[in-house]
């Protein structure tokens, strides 16, 4: 295949029903007598003369229309004819195994409601466009040219056609045209022989339209360089409209037919610019290296040249299948792609490329279900020795499944921006078994990488699958990755993925020798789950000159478990990236980690957690050996937690950690840590109601440094349980901000004042001051100096003033009550009245009253002639 800027769409194979061959007859071209058409026969060659003319339109009508192998059917029209309209009325399929041709630049229309088969030897020799259809009639503004209504004379009009009319169950169109050309090109590796599958071909800038019934393309080609190829059809009665731009409008509410491409079937509009492929069907199936190609051909194009788009509208499904299981990027399988500078495979199997100049077009897929399997591919790329932008890839569906397949937008070594990849699915998107969603700029390219945007109900990234937006060399920024799900986002390595380096990844990164910034990763969903060594990373690698990105998670429940990691690391002198999580609940367990740090001389990144509910940090052991290298793990392989630590060789300071939560719970090596080697430790700021740690399980809050100063730890909490400020110890839960050679940091723990009056009071030495709370009611003994006293021991049940009334829960006193009035006792401090009632206010305060209250029997002590101090236990 040639190296081009192109769009490739792989199509699945189909099994052709034998019914399509019914009613086919021996190759022949015969008029039906309804027009003035004549046919001259010379062996296998048929020359078509006369016909009915109206202005620039010429009309022919045939009873049979089939062309034998190595034969031809040539329309010998005047050069000033614009359109040739041909209908087949005899009730048999047209088998075209030879050449169809016409004079001048006339467009050729061929309709046969029974079906059309283009055999291996079928070719076109036209100066204009070709329209093949199994419609009943061609519509005009003033009538129709019908192949089924022969009772009325055919319409002969000077107007341009406006569309096609179909009856129920129109015939199918099959293309097996396998005409090929061998072209030689020369590039930096020498001369290469390229075999192009041409098939049915028109001149550059002209169009090919095939409208059925079902359309079957197998082991064949359709080529319209820089033109438009329309493929589609209806399976029920309806009308299709011709648009001025060469595209078609299909009716709503009418069932469409199917399109299949298999056995290297190729649909190609690549040229020096332009070229669109439009597919309008019910189901599109692609397999065995079927391809839709649009773009800039090798050694063609010019600055600013724009390749066309591939647009697929499938009301039910699009299925793209490769040949082999697994992924082998150098080979070409079934795919939808948009290339500038197509990589070529030499006869020895090695890969090379040739140049092109211009921008790749876009890929637009609209369907209910998109499935891409086993090396099926969507790709928009600019390859070496080419120059320009890659195009956008946009999929709108209800359900998307990508299994062992890539969706790619790439620029390799040249100048240009990478196109964005956007996947929208109302129900679900599943990327599984080593599939890749990639927006990447590689080599010395000057330009930005593309963005990856995913909007869906539920999203899963499973097995060895990856989403990557990165910049590898050159100048420019890496792209952003945005995932929004109305239900859930799930990432996990599968149990069958036993290889140590295989794990699901979402990566926005800046790699070596790149000048630019890494992208942002934003994931939003009610439930976000990372498990079994899943990785989300926004980083800047060694030798890159630029800032790492950040990771933001927005959800209700976020769980990071079984060795999964979110990191915003950098190996540059720039500050590390940030991690932000906004949720109601956050769990880090079984080796799950948040890591923001710096391996060079910059400062570590910051981590900010805004959690309205609980944060749980527990169990430092991941479920097996981690596939992550020491760059990510540092010395944290057997820990769970939140880390803004710098590497040992780093001279920067640790990052800051800010946490807001209702409760933070530590279990078994759950940690919060910011540390540095030569720089200062970072700050940890925690605002929570409670911090609870299971005792003696080495769960720590640390802001340390080796050579620099320790960081600061500020904690605002109602209470801390099981963890306290002290030196680090593997058997305890510690809060520590120390430095080995520098100054220790500062730890500030703020808990609320326990005084419920919210004011400072100097408390007396005794709990109850008897001289103020015990009334001297022993009147007979006052003159003798004998005073009353009350010592209360025990808990509850006894009021602190002896004249207070008891409730039902107090102790019982077995003595009669007196009805004698008790007069107030006069003291230097004023009159003292025995309490006779108790009132509880609405805000919970208890007030003792000098008068009896309802439903309470005030307890008035019996006056004794001799009182003494008594003790109540």
Language model: regions and residue ranges:
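Extracellular and secretory-pathway beta-repeat/beta-biased strand scaffolds
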Residues: 2-873
């Amino acid at each position: 295949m040639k190296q081009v800027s192109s769009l490739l769409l792989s199509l699945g194979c189909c099994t052709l029903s034998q019914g399509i061959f019914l009613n086919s007859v021996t190759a022949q071209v015969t008029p039906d007598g309804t027009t003035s058409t004549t046919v001259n026969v010379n062996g296998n060659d048929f020359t078509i003369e006369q016909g009915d003319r109206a202005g620039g339109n010429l009309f022919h009508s045939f009873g049979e229309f089939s062309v034998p192998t190595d034969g031809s059917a040539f329309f010998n029209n005047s050069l000033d004819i614009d359109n040739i309209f041909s209908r087949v009325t005899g009730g048999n399929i047209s088998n075209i195994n030879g050449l169809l041709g016409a004079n001048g630049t006339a467009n050729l229309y061929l309709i046969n409601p029974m079906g059309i088969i283009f055999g291996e030897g079928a070719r076109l020799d036209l100066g204009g466009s070709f329209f093949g259809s199994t419609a009943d009639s061609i519509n005009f503004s003033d009538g129709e040219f019908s192949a089924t209504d022969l009772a009325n004379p055919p319409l002969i009009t000077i107007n341009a056609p406006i569309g096609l009319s179909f009856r129920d169950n129109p015939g199918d169109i099959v293309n097996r045209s396998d005409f090929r050309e061998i072209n030689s090109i020369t590039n930096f590796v020498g001369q290469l022989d390229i075999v192009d599958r041409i098939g049915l071909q028109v001149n550059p800038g002209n169009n090919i339209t095939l409208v059925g019934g079902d359309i079957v393309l197998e082991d064949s080609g359709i080529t319209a360089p820089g033109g438009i190829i329309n493929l589609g059809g209806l399976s029920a009665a309806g009308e299709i409209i011709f648009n001025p731009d060469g595209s078609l409008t299909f009716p709503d509410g009418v069932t469409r037919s199917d399109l299949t491409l298999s056995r290297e079937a190729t649909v190609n509009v690549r040229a020096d610019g332009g070229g669109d492929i439009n597919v309008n069907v019910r189901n599109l199936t692609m397999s065995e290296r079927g391809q839709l190609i649009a773009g800039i051909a090798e050694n063609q194009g010019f600055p600013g040249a724009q390749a066309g788009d591939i647009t697929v509208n499938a009301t039910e499904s699009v299925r793209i299948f490769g040949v082999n299981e697994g992924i082998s990027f150098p080979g070409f399988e079934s795919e939808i792609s948009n290339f500038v500078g197509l990589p070529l495979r030499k006869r020895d199997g090695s890969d090379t490329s040739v140049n092109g100049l211009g921008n790749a077009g876009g890929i637009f897929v609209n369907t209910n279900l998109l499935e891409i399997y086993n090396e099926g591919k969507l790709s928009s790329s600019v390859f070496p020795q080419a120059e320009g932008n890659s195009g956008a890839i946009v999929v709108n569906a209800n359900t998307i499944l990508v299994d062992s397949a890539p969706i790619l937008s790439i620029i390799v070594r040249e100048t240009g921006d990478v196109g964005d990849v956007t996947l929208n699915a109302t129900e679900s998107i599943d990327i599984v078994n080593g599939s890749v969603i990639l927006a990447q700029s590689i080599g010395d390219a000057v330009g930005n990488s593309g963005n990856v945007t995913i909007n869906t109900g539920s999203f899963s990234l499973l097995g060895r699958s990856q989403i990557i937006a990165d910049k590898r060399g050159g100048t420019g920024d890496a792209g952003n990755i945005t995932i929004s799900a109305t239900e859930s986002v799930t990432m996990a390595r599968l149990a069958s993925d036993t290889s140590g380096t295989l794990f699901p990844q979402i990566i926005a990164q800046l790699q070596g020798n790149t000048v630019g910034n890494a992208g942002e990763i934003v994931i939003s969903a009610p439930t976000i789950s990372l498990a079994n060594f899943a990785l989300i990373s926004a980083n800047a690698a060694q030798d890159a000159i630029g800032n790492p990105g950040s990771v933001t998670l927005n959800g209700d429940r976020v769980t990071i478990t079984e060795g999964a990691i979110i990191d915003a690391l950098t190996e540059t002198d720039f500050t590390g990236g940030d991690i932000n999580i906004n949720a109601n609940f956050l769990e880090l367990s079984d080796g799950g980690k948040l890591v923001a740090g710096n391996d060079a001389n910059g400062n570590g990144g910051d981590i900010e957690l805004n959690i309205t509910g609980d944060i749980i940090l527990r169990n430092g052991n991941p479920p097996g050996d981690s596939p992550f290298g020491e760059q990510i793990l540092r010395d944290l392989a057997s820990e769970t937690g939140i880390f803004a630590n710098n590497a040992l060789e780093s001279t920067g300071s640790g990052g800051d950690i800010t946490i807001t939560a209702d409760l933070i719970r530590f279990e078994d090596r759950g940690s919060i840590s910011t540390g540095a080697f030569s720089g200062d430790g970072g700050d940890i700021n925690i605002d929570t109601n409670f911090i609870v740690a299971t005792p003696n399980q080495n769960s720590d809050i640390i802001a340390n440094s080796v050579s620099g100063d320790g960081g600061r730890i500020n904690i605002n909490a109602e209470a801390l349980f099981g963890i306290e400020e002290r030196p680090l110890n593997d058997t305890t839960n510690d809060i520590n901000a120390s430095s080995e050679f520098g100054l220790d940091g500062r730890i500030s723990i703020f808990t609320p004042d326990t005084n419920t009056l919210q004011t400072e009071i100097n408390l007396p030495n005794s709990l109850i001051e008897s001289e103020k709370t015990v009334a001297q009611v022993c009147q007979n003994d006052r003159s003798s100096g004998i005073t009353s006293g009350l010592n209360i021991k025990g808990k509850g049940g006894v009021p602190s003033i002896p004249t207070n009334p008891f409730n039902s829960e107090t102790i019982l006193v077995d003595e009669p009550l007196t009805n004698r009035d008790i007069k107030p006792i006069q003291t230097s401090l004023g009159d003292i009245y025995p309490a006779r009632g108790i009132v509880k206010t609405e805000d919970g305060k208890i007030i003792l009253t000098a008068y009896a209250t309802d439903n309470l029997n005030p307890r008035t002590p019996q006056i004794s002639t001799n009182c003494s101090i008594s003790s109540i236990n």
